[in-house]
């Protein structure tokens, strides 16, 4: 746990404003994104709140009264088809071969629109043959929504091709390192592919939604494929619809 790495044997009395501020600085030095730090702080705050409710900490000493969790607005970074193709065609060799699983997992999630948390919870049981075609059926860790994906129809079945690479040890494919380390792998991978765009694993999900909408897939269908409970959540991609309109009208020239 990062907090224990920062300071071993922490007691409730140690959880002061000064310690939390120092922990934030520690995470910054480790290179964590502002919003990633915010996730760790929210997790810590939740435990502090429980401790206060159980009277392990006096309410007067509530550290988060002064400390404000900082976040920045996330832009939905996505890859355009040409950038995705560069990653698909990237050949890793030498000391970079060890990055292959991170690359393949990222590409698979570009085709399936999955979150990191859902990908690492997959097993072979999530893949089902329906009418002799491969479907991926899973329950979202974040929302609890069941998602049903016809992999054979998504992105020309490229996700199935990746699964076939790992068919002898499929469970290992889903056992990635932690999200932050995989994101570090992706920074190296994009540099090797000649891409200047900074991506994270979640970029795969945004890429999936963006390219589906750009290629004319109905937003309600995209909502179902992403496992969004409400179409309003999917409408963050409406800026892509403008691109789609331009794309369609240019065909008429």
What is each PLM-predicted segment?
Residues 94-96, 167-172, 176, 184-224:
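Short, basic (Lys/Arg/His-rich) helix/loop patches that form interaction surfaces
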Residues 73, 141-188:
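C-terminal catalytic core of Y-nucleophile DNA break-rejoin enzymes
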Residues 127-133, 196-197, 217-236, 243:
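Short, polar N-cap/turn motifs at the start of nucleic acid-interacting alpha helices
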Residues 107, 111, 118, 205-229, ...:
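C-terminal catalytic core of tyrosine-transesterase DNA break-rejoin enzymes
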Residues 2, 29-63, 117:
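N-terminal DNA-binding recognition helix of tyrosine site-specific recombinases/integrases
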Residues 34, 38, 57-116:
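Basic, Lys/Arg- and aromatic-enriched nucleic-acid-binding interface segment
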Residues 78, 140-144, 226, 230-251:
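Catalytic-site neighborhood detector that most strongly recognizes the C-terminal catalytic loop/helix
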Residues 1-30, 49:
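Basic/aromatic-enriched alpha-helical hairpins
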């Amino acid at each position: 746990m990062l907090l224990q790495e920062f300071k071993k044997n922490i007691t409730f009395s140690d959880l002061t404003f000064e310690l939390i501020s120092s922990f934030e600085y520690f995470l910054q030095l480790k290179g964590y994104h502002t919003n990633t730090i915010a996730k760790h702080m929210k997790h810590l705050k939740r435990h502090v709140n429980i401790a206060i409710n159980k009277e392990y900490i006096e309410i007067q000493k509530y550290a988060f009264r002064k400390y404000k969790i900082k976040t920045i607005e996330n832009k939905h970074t996505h890859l355009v088809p040409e950038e995705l193709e560069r990653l698909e065609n990237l050949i890793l060799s030498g000391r970079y071969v060890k990055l292959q699983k991170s690359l393949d997992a990222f590409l698979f999630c570009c085709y399936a629109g999955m979150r990191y948390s859902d990908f690492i919870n997959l097993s072979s049981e999530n893949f089902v043959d329906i009418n002799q075609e491969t479907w991926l059926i899973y329950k979202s860790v974040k929302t609890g929504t069941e998602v049903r994906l016809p992999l054979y129809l998504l992105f020309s079945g490229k996700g199935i091709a990746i699964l076939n690479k790992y068919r002898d040890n499929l469970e290992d494919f889903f056992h990635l390192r932690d999200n932050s380390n995989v994101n570090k792998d992706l920074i190296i991978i994009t540099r090797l592919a000649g891409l200047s765009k900074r991506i994270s694993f979640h970029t795969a999900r945004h890429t999936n939604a963006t390219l589906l909408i750009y290629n004319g897939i109905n937003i309600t269908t995209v909502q179902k494929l992403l496992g969004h409970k409400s179409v309003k959540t999917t409408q963050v991609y409406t800026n892509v619809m403008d691109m789609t309109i331009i794309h369609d009208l240019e065909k008429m020239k």
